[in-house]
Amino acid sequence: MPSRERSPSSGLGFQSDSSRSSPPDAGVTAHKRKRSPTRSVSSRSTSSRSPSRSRSPPPRSRRRRRSSRDRSQSSNSDESTEERKNTTRAREALEQNAKTLEIAAKGEALRSTLAQLSATKSGGAYVPPARLKALMAEAAAADPGSVEYQRMSWDALKKSITGLVNKVAVENIKSIVPELFGGANLIRGRGLYCRSIMRAQALSLSFTPVFAALTAIVNTKLPMIGELLAVRLVSQFRRSFKRNDKAVCNSTAMFLAHLVNQRVVHEVLALEILVLLLEKPTDDSVEIAVGFMREVGAFLTEEAPKANNSIFDRFRAVLYEGEISKRVQYMIEVLSQVRREGFKENPRIPDALDLVEEDDQITHRISLDDQLNIEEGLNVFKMDPEFVENEERYRSIKAEILGENSDSDKTGSEADSESGSSSDDSSDDEAGEGPDDAQRQLEIHDRTETNLINLRRTIYLTIMSSLDFEESVHKLLKLEVPEGQDIELCNMIVECCSQERTYSKFYGNMGERFCKLHRKWADTFAQSFSNYYDTIHRYETNRLRNIARFFGHLFSTDSISWASMSVIHMNEEDTTSSSRIFVKIMFQEMQQQLGLKELAERFKEPSLQENWKGLFPTDNPKSTRFSINYFTSIGLGVLTEEMREYLKNAPKLLLAQRQAALAARGSDNSDSDSSSVLSSSTGSRSRTSYSSYSRSSRSYSSGSGSYSSRSRSSRSYSSRSYSSRSYSSRSRSRSRSRSRSRSRSRSRSRSRSRSRSPSEHQRHGRRRARSASYSSYSSRSRSSSSSSSRSRSRSRSRSRSFSRSLTPRGSYSRSCSRSPVPRRRAPRSRSRSADPRKRSSRRSPSVSSYSGSETDDSISRSPSPRAGYVDRRSHRHSRSASPARR
């Protein structure tokens, strides 16, 4: 047998065939196969690999047995693999169930523990954040609307809000706001927010502007929170005021003041608080009011100036009453000083906290007398049956506030999943469009005039830091003033000048130097003069005086053209009290620097008369009289000579025009009618004391205007104003007169007057009389006015009276008389009115010293009767005669 086993593989096939034929050897062969299967397989593989040794294929029966054996082995291996997999799955399922049960048991234990701890008043013991987070995740997975989860979310909300409020500062407020909106449901926790921020503000008053700014930002998105905070603060202020709790009242008032500055609360509430505190002043109430006013004073000065002035008047009254302590009185004085400085140390809103646009802010109108609901129930936990819906609603609101957009995230993920080429193309496109988009975003339109404010600040600091005007001009010329803003430099110089307590020549010399350096500065200052004259009524007296003296210096030094005075219209309609004071101070400054004589000569410049028509009007007698009175009252009557001459000649021109119109009619009736018209138009009611006027009629002679002067030679004008009453006065006589006067140097003048005077019998309705008187004289005068003739003029006059009168019997009488007129006496016509001497002394306040010896030659004619008459000549004194008086 061993030899058979060592036989070569080539004889195996033969022996197997022989064994098949001989049955006794079959068992031995099978035993051999079982003991060495590997060898048989290797022999088969060897025979298959080397066909040269054995070229005949194996028998069919052998192949069948081998394939069936292989099938049985593979089926057994598959069954064992499936069994192993099933066993593994069952084991994993058991482990997972065990873990789930363990987690549920732990969660139930934690929930029970949390419920027991949270049942206490203090809110329970400290739970580590990791454990609390796991607990909340477990509760949310189990039931998001459960009471346990709502309680845990409420505690987390309270801790989040309190932590963020305590952490906020000027430096990190911009990062705290997104966390506040994103990490907490402020709509649900608005009561917690108000309570936390009120507590934090009461403990740290210096952070009140920060808390107010944070509330202002929240109020723009969630106005209900700002309103609730304002309501609670007002309620707390009322309670503390009634309880005399000074600390709480002071902190609450300060918080409300900053909310008013941020426009969260209307300024009416601030005024009501001030009125309440100052209604019955005590040391504590006045102290709180002073602190409140320092915080809100800058805002009230801009928004409610009238109410602010009334509050300071009340402060002043409290100070003068003296019912408060010295310390509080000193606080009021310090507050007044702070107000004069413009609240520099207490601005409305610090620059770092000015984070809300004025148009975006929502202002709440709350009064101290309103019925307020502070909603204390929002401070404690309550189960919300719609908790899940409210949370989803707040998520959408948070997305709108913070700008979160799921589409953008989706777009970003899709962009990441794109192919390399498409991503490269899109990146190229974005790179090409990026700078343009950035440039469009950077186009900012500054409508706050920040650059203009900075320019003014620079000019102001430059002026104030200069030792003399030359240094200031040199520094200002180095400034890069933008094109078109040269006027701002001039305005700032004038404003700085007006801010001084008294006028300083520093600013006048500065303006003069600018004007003489370049023509554009002269034109700019001229434009500035026009602007300031139009708005001078807005300035108080001290500032007005400084501005007037500044421009007076510029005019007196010829820095700006005198034609700029064309904006001044000196009449009653176009001037105000401020503008008249401005012109007065400006002209007095010019007079002080130039002198009265030089000033008068400058105003006689012919080329500028057109520009001074508004200053010295000659188009309307009323405006002329107003200008004369004004300049005479300020001591510059010498400037009004031409206007006075105009007033003298104006009636003559008017009378000549009327006479030319009446001469066209050419009839006696028209003459008689026109005489009445002319007498009424020229004003026959005279109350003057001039010796050149006739008491029976108004004669517009050369002495018609009454001057308040002392002497013609000295040209010194008194302060007595021009009397328009004396100019437009009328005689009270009943005679109707028509007069023409002509006066020439060393020539003869004749005056003709017609008068009808009823006799005594005519008054009783019994008789009528007509009289006519003729008189003529010749006089010599030095000037063109009879009222300004020499006091020693030589005059010879003859008076001829020719009258026709109707006697009671129906006959006519005629008389003619000649009588010399006494020297140095002016003719005076009598009428039936009262004694003219008494009336003259009573009605005529202004007496002219211009007139010397005055004479008048009057001729009076009356139409003769149609019937016959008797001619008689006699020296008699009739009512229509005009005797002379001294």
Swiss-Prot record:
Lineage top rank: taxon: Eukaryota
Occurrences of domain MIF4G (ranges): 158-342
Regions of compositional bias (Acidic residues) in chain numbering: 425-436
Gene Ontology CC annotations of this record: catalytic step 2 spliceosome; cytoplasm
UniProt-annotated stretches for the region Disordered: 1-90, 400-445, 664-886
UniProt biased composition (Low complexity): 38-55, 672-730, 771-790, 802-820, 843-853
Pfam families (UniProt xref): MA3 (PF02847), MIF4G (PF02854)
Keywords: Cytoplasm, mRNA processing, mRNA splicing, Nucleus, Spliceosome
GO terms, biological process: mRNA splicing, via spliceosome
Listed Gene3D superfamilies: 1.25.40.180
InterPro entries named among the record's database cross-references: ARM-type_fold (IPR016024), CWC22_splicing_factor (IPR050781), Initiation_fac_eIF4g_MI (IPR003891), MIF4G-like_typ-3 (IPR003890)
Compartments, record wording: Cytoplasm; Nucleus
Molecular functions (GO terms): RNA binding
Chain ranges of the MI domain: 454-570
Ranges of Polar residues composition bias in the record: 8-22
Feature: compositional bias, Basic residues: 731-755, 791-801, 821-831, 873-886
Known partners and oligomeric status: Associated with the spliceosome.
Family: Belongs to the CWC22 family.
Known role: Involved in pre-mRNA splicing.
Name this polypeptide is given: Pre-mRNA-splicing factor CWC22
